[in-house]
């Protein structure tokens, strides 16, 4: 039971830290463009919870 509670807490943190992901990919894209990247998308590897930026000229 304790392990389940910890996993749920970690999942909630990841969902709030996703710059719009998984619900708003446009917000993720806008975030990435605002920091100088070409585009952004919600990463399927993390079940669409993480915003991944592309072509950032040395930034990530």
Swiss-Prot record:
Residues 1-17 form the signal peptide. The keyword Transmembrane does not apply. GO terms for biological process: defense response to bacterium; innate immune response. PROSITE patterns: INVERT_DEFENSINS (PS51378). Residues 22-25, 43-49 are annotated as: Binds to membrane interface. InterPro entries: Defensin_invertebrate/fungal, Scorpion_toxin-like_sf. Expressed in hemocytes. Antibacterial peptide mostly active against Gram-positive bacteria. It acts by selectively inhibiting peptidoglycan biosynthesis through complex formation with the cell wall precursor lipid II (1:1 molar ratio) thus inhibiting cell wall synthesis. It does not disrupt cell membranes. Is noticeably less potent than Cg-Defh2 and Cg-Defm. Shows no or limited activities against Gram-negative bacteria. This is Hemocyte defensin Cg-Defh1. It comes from Magallana gigas.
């Amino acid at each position: 039971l304790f392990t389940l509670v910890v996993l749920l807490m970690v999942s909630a943190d990841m969902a709030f830290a996703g710059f719009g992901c998984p619900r708003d990919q446009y917000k993720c894209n806008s975030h990435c463009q605002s920091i100088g990247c070409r585009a952004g998308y919600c990463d399927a590897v993390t079940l669409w919870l993480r915003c991944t930026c592309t072509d950032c000229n040395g930034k990530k």
